[in-house]
A protein has these predicted regions:
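Bacterial Sec-dependent N-terminal signal peptides
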Residues: 1-25
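Glycan-recognition and catalytic cores of secretory/periplasmic carbohydrate-active enzymes
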Residues: 20-401
Length: 401
């Protein structure tokens, strides 16, 4: 009985925050909160010997109060998000100390521009950090790191298949000759940027080819996405679509669909080809149609444990950010994004004083029992990105800054 009462209370709380009028979100208050939490994290990272700028905040488990940090290595795909958070916080606060910290953490990732590609995550690692750093400072050294890393990422492109290989390490163990995951759509932005900022024009062609093949093979007829598409390297044909982090091969994993929404919005921005805008709308529609009332998805839309399954705040943050950009191309999406941000900015999803992260209730890798109902750094990154995008739109600026 006690569990039932608690469960009803939580569900009621989720419903209440969904009814906030979309125009009432105080974006400056939410950004002030992010600034406070960023300062808390920096204070936590500081030891008697100073800050180790190679150690990046990754997650805080539900029963913990402090960040678990991981070394910035080629294997740590999340290492670029904390520097990105700092750059976004600097953009809002104009705090020179935050800028200095952003520079130091960002510099820890320079090595990625000088080594062969470990996997496709170079966009997450370098464009979230160096990309934002260059946008705000125009430091030419940052630009060169981005250009060099984009060239490295392109070495994973297979012209027979037409996509970038996501996980070379999984080719033999899983018998996935050429595997491409939906997350890879996010890395295309770095290729587009490099191609128009002095890099090899071929990078544009790689990004477009990847987007086209993914659009053709990575989605079911209802526009829900597989997490992984496995291709034949001889024929280039699709072998199968499977999951890796979702509930099952046939289900809609929330963050995977979020990557698709964000990714195709970017592809339309960079190409202005209406087929990508149409596709972005379609993959968005199937996501929005199945959301719970507070607009924060269950980690997988088809988990049979719903409504008791965990939510994924990270997916909501990614989609909110994407929808704010998409709303500048289509006459809808902004209100839904504000509803998502209103929920994420409520006491049910913000960490508040309990932890130095921005958000609670994200899911990393359910099948591996990893980062379940946790605070995760990429949720914070896309949350502050979305808040800044909303602030810019309200102030009559371009959504990207």
């Amino acid at each position: 009985m006690k569990k039932l009462v608690v469960g009803l209370a939580v569900m009621l709380g989720f419903c209440m925050c969904a009814h906030q009028p979309s125009g009432t979100l105080d974006v400056n208050k939410a950004l002030d909160y992010c600034a406070e939490q960023t300062q808390r994290t920096l204070a936590e990272l500081k030891t008697d010997s100073g800050i180790d700028y190679t150690m990046m905040p990754r997650n805080i488990m539900a029963d913990e109060q402090h960040w678990n940090c991981r070394k910035a290595t080629k294997e740590e795909w999340c290492a670029g998000f904390w520097p990105g958070v700092l750059w976004y916080d600097y953009e809002y606060t104009q705090d020179k100390h935050i800028k200095e910290e952003a520079e130091k953490f960002t510099n820890s990732l320079e090595f990625l521009s000088k080594i062969p590609a470990f996997d496709h995550d170079l966009g997450f690692l370098v464009f979230c950090s160096y990309g934002n750093g260059y946008r705000l400072t125009k430091n030419p050294a940052y630009k060169q790191v981005i250009l060099d890393t984009a060239d490295t990422l392109a070495t994973l492109f297979n012209p027979v298949v037409g996509t970038i290989l996501s996980w070379p390490r999984e080719v033999e163990p899983r018998n996935w000759p050429h595997n491409t995951i939906m997350d890879n759509m996010i890395n295309l932005e770095m290729l587009f940027w490099a191609a128009k900022n002095g890099g090899n024009p071929y990078l544009y062609d790689v990004a477009v080819a990847h987007a086209d093949k993914t659009m053709k093979c990575h989605f079911r007829p209802d526009y829900t996405s597989y997490h992984v598409a496995v291709y034949d390297t001889i024929t280039g044909n699709l072998i199968k679509g499977v999951t890796h982090q979702g509930y099952a091969d046939s289900t809609m994993w929330a963050r995977g669909q979020a990557w698709a929404i964000y990714g195709y919005t970017v592809v339309y921005r960079e190409t202005k080809d209406p087929k990508y805008l149409d596709f972005a709308q379609k993959v968005t529609d199937v996501y929005l149609e199945r959301l719970p009332e507070d607009k924060v998805p269950y980690w997988d839309f088809d988990d049979p444990g719903i409504p008791d399954a965990p939510r994924d705040a990270s997916a909501a943050a990614v989609v909110a950010s994407a929808l704010l950009e998409l709303s500048t191309y289509l006459p809808n999406g902004k209100d839904a994004a504000i509803e998502m941000l209103s929920s994420l900015s409520s006491r049910h999803y913000q960490s508040g004083k309990s932890k130095p992260s921005f958000l609670l209730h994200s899911v990393g890798h359910w099948p591996n029992h990893s980062e379940i109902d946790a605070s995760i750094i990429y949720a914070d990154y896309y949350y502050i990105e979305a808040l800044l995008r909303l602030k810019r739109l309200r102030e009559g600026q371009t959504v990207q800054g």
